[in-house]
Amino acid sequence: MRILMLSSTFPYPPSRGGTEIRTFNLLRYLRHSHDITLLTQRHQDVTDADVEELKKWVSHLLIFALPAEPIPQKGMSGLFAKAGRFIESVAKATPVNVLHRYSPEIQDLVDSYVREGKCDVITCEHSVNEIYIRPEFRHRVNTVVDIHSSVCGWTRDHLEMGASPHPLRDRLSLALILKRYEKKYSSKFSSIVVTTEDDRQEFIKLRPDIKIEVIPNGVDLELFPYRSNDPGGTNLSFVGAMDASHNIDAARFFAIEILPELQKHHPDITFSIVGARPTPEVLELKNLPGVIVTGKVDSMVGYLHQSIISVIPLRTGFGIKNKTLEAMAAGLPVVGSDRALEGLAVDSNNLPLRALRANHKDEYVTAISQLLENPQLRSELSQNAREYVETEFTWESAGRRYEKVLL
């Protein structure tokens, strides 16, 4: 099968973020049996070594420049520029960031591949790539969008939890752009792939005529080996890219609202915020007692293995979370929110207990205290979680299911 894969996000190294992890690992599975041409865009953090490494995993790698960010303008000219971009976004029912990343050169190449019959299937790795798919393509070639997460659900979540940094803008965007956008682009594709049942329910309203496949993320079990022992102690960890709004909100929520309450009962408890690119809002948390902000680390799994519990206090964000699966694979007991545990059967009736659920301050305090004081419960969650990931959430399993959609 000749696959034309579109990924505006440069998918290497597969540790930079959730989009990179999912795209690379699905690509890695497919390349064993299929010819893959990858079209991607290079941002300033991509090194020549990254490019050379990615070339090893595809048949053809075509790299395009990522447009420069608009230069901020002050005063009225800046307001007019922002208003102009927003009006264009409303008129085209397409988010500003999607329009900004659009490359006419990529469009010309995609058009030529379809016109000349040079591919059997086109995959869009994340919905942002849908902009290159013309509605008529699906009559000539199989077109698949792997959505990763619903932008409507994501934005609505941020607004409901008060986590949006620009609530007025996001309310307008949700009402005037995003709902129309998801309806418009979902109609173009032969097949739709999502990562969770929640996202499937979002899109089944828009495309009741096709089967929407749920393919959850996986974990590279070699990169996240099961820890050899319970380290004990009182160090909690939260991992992720610390410039992402949902992670910023989660880190601040836990450090400011939950940790002080825990410290009343466990004075020695510490909270490590582990991940690259911490913003000023995250960095200032290290001034709080017991909070450690590491920035980028050489080994994420090393920090996980040194922690007694992984806390994942996400209040926003749709889609299955790599950080949850990775912590479970590494053998950490997990205390997470509904958003952190989305798509995972961790505390259902008649199933082994695989994580503890908490959404409010008192629930976090109770669950974490329970685990700190009960080594047997920690061991139970650790073993059950690892077995669950090994059975249900490997990239090989996800790749097999994705391949069936593409065929």
Show the residue positions of the predicted features.
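N-terminal subdomain of nucleotide-sugar transferases
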Residues: 1-65, 117
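Donor nucleotide-sugar binding/catalytic pocket of nucleotide-sugar-dependent glycosyltransferases
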Residues: 63, 142-145, 152, 171-179, ...
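Conserved nucleotide-sugar donor-binding subdomain of glycosyltransferases
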Residues: 76-131, 166-188
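Acidic donor-binding loop of glycosyltransferase active sites
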Residues: 190, 290, 305-319, 330-332
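Conserved catalytic-core segment of nucleotide-activated headgroup transferases in glycan assembly
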Residues: 214-289, 293-306
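Short hydrophobic beta-strand element within catalytic cores of glycosyltransferases
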Residues: 323-326, 333-340
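A short, well-ordered alpha-helix in the C-terminal region of glycosyltransferases
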Residues: 370, 377-391, 401
